Every structure is written in C-alpha cells, then in structure tokens.
C-alpha cells in the first residue's frame, strides 16, 4: 500500500531536478549578405549539438543544418529555395531578401533555450549619373531638378475594421481588415494601385487572390478592394487557413504612378468576383517566394542606367529651345517624370504574415466567444485542481472511518438525550 506515495515522491524529485539544456546563443547572429545566398552563423556558449533550420521547413533538404561538436552553428540559404522571400522597395530603392531561421539546441525537440530570428538583407540600388560634354556658343539655360521621394508603403491586417489594431494571431472566421497604406512627403502627387496578390503557406503552396489588374478572384477569400484615398486601399475579410498549416503569408504588389494635376487617380474596373476562382500557381515555391538571385542583382545594377539616361538630353534641348509658357514647361516636367518610370520602376512588394488557430469542435465561435471559452475552461481547471484526489482504496477507507464516526456520534447523542429512569 506504500508504493503510490513513493512514486509520487520520485516524480516530484525528478521535476525539481529538471533543468534546461546547458547552452545558448552568445551575442547576436552574424549575417553575411552574399550575391547568391544569405549565410547566418551563431556563436554558442558550449559545443553545439542540435539543428539550424528555416522555420516551417525542418524536413526539406537543404533548409536544415545539423551541427555538432563546435561552438559555432550556421546555415547558408540560397535566394531561390527554402522560402527565401524577395520584396522590392522604392524608398529606399532596392531589394529586401528575408527569411526566418530557428536554432534548436536539442537534437529532437524544441525547448525553452531555442531561438528564432528574422533575417533580412537589403541590396540597395545605386544611382548612376550619365553626363556628356557640349560646346555652347550662346547663353545657356540652367536646368534644375528637384527629386521627390517615393512613398513608403506597408501592408497590415487589422482586427475588425479599418480602425482596428494590427494582429498576428487570429481564429478561423474572425473578421479582419486588409489595409495597404503609402506615406508620402507630398500631397496630390502619387497614386497607388494594389494588384498581383498571393497567399502561401511558407512551403511553396501559393494561391493568387488578386490578379495583375487588381481585381479579386475569389469572393470567399478577398473581395474587390476599396480606395478611400489616393494612397490607401482596403477590404474586409474573414480569416481562413490551409488544412494543415497555421501560417499564412500574403504578398502583393503596389504600383506607384504620378497623379495628373486636377484629375482623380485611375482605379481598377472589376466585375463582381465569383466563388472558388482563386488560381493556384504551379511551382511557386521558389519562383514566387524568392526570385533567381543573379537576376535580382542584375536588376538592381542595371535599372539606374535606364532611369538616368534622359538627364543629359534636356540640357542640350534647353540650350536651343525658345521660351515657352510656364504651363507648357510644367506639362513637360510631368511627362519627363512619367517617362522616368521604366518597366517595374514604380512597382514595389509588400508582405505580411498571420498565424491562425485551428477550428474548434462543434459550433464555430467568434473570437470573443473563443476567448471566453478559454477563460471558462481555465477557471474550471483551477477549480478542479484545488480539490482532493483519492485512490479507490483510500476512498473506501475514508468512507469506513466516516461511517464509524457517524455511528459513534449518533450513539453518544442517543445516550445523552435518553430520559432518566426513577426508582420506586
């Protein structure tokens, strides 16, 4: 009858002596942004016995590094694999290459000392100036250019509606608001149009939900966008997820164009989307999430030449051109600005991530109801944990002792309360 308390005592001793893995990351990760890949190295306090892998791709070949015996652990990730995402930026001008890397110190499990890092490299596009020498026999007209910074854009998923807070976690069916916003230092200068939106699970399964014109493809996933201002777009939606994945990665393109004076920004003309019209993209794991590395570098280096070439021409033209009205000069400057936007010059990428909780059994509750259920369940567990647990033998013993005590108490009360007999 004494074996159960002994086992419980042993369990308490084991839980008290359990300690975390005796290792951790020393300092910050060392990131090397190469021309074809990103290399991440970690310095550890003790010799490393574990794994370094891309989040969500533990079992994919080439996306995990198994290290052992050294105090340095690392991994090299090519641009065209392992869900390495590439996003274009107009301000600052260049390309962001990003991924999430996990360092795990246990050979089999994720423990409390493990860490996940969001790694990002920025490849800036350098500006090149093309000049030429001319001989002028008469008075020349100076040419002055003022550079207007491009807008800075972001993509957010808000809770409930346009005024909600950005969220990273949601339940299936929860109402959210997809919001695209561009901030500009000037007013009435630029127009923004959102298009080419996709959603993927981080493992190559990519579905297009907005086409190249900015029209919705599946009304159950996302409806046609609304444009409250020149540089803002949004639409309400409900949270969904892949069958066996909790993460969703949304990526869209935003086209920035010059706004014509006195006119409205052009918006996509879209018909009402049908249900189940989203297009699954074949082979999107590497091509969409991360474009070919060398092509990305060539794009960064070659674009400034095409953008800067028209600079020299106005100088020569201005020397020989007669005086023209100020309004005509303004129109010419506007045309020059538009011509400076070459192919893909005014297009940038925005990306956002959301984690979804799986569907609950029975009726599907809303987010507040789900929170209430979780709170109620925790209260029930706390109330249960304050009770007394007995084995069947212990319960029988407790019941027997209680019966004896109750019988003795009843006999005592009967003896005390009985009437006193009188002698005759």
Swiss-Prot record:
The small repeats A-A-P-[AVI] are also present in many proteins constituting the protective envelope of other species. This is Cuticlin-1. SMART domains: ZP (SM00241). PANTHER family: CUTICLIN-1, GH04558P. Residues 302-323 are annotated as: 4 X 4 AA repeats of A-A-P-[AVI]. Residues 19-392 are extracellular. Keywords: Cell membrane, Cuticle, Disulfide bond, Membrane, Repeat, Secreted, Signal, Transmembrane, Transmembrane helix. Residues 414-424 are cytoplasmic. It is a single-pass type I membrane protein. It is found in: Cell membrane; Secreted. Residues 32-277 form the ZP domain. It holds the Pfam family CUT_N. Sequence repeats lie at residues 302-305, 307-311, 312-315, 320-323. Disruption phenotype: RNAi-mediated knockdown results in no alae in dauer stage larvae, which results in a wider lateral cuticle and larger body diameter. The keyword NADP does not apply. One of its GO terms (molecular function) is structural constituent of cuticle. One of its GO terms (cellular component) is plasma membrane. Disulfide bonds join 197-252. The keyword Coiled coil does not apply. InterPro entries: CUT_N, Cuticlin, ZP_dom. The chain crosses the membrane at residues 393-413. Residues 1-18 form the signal peptide.
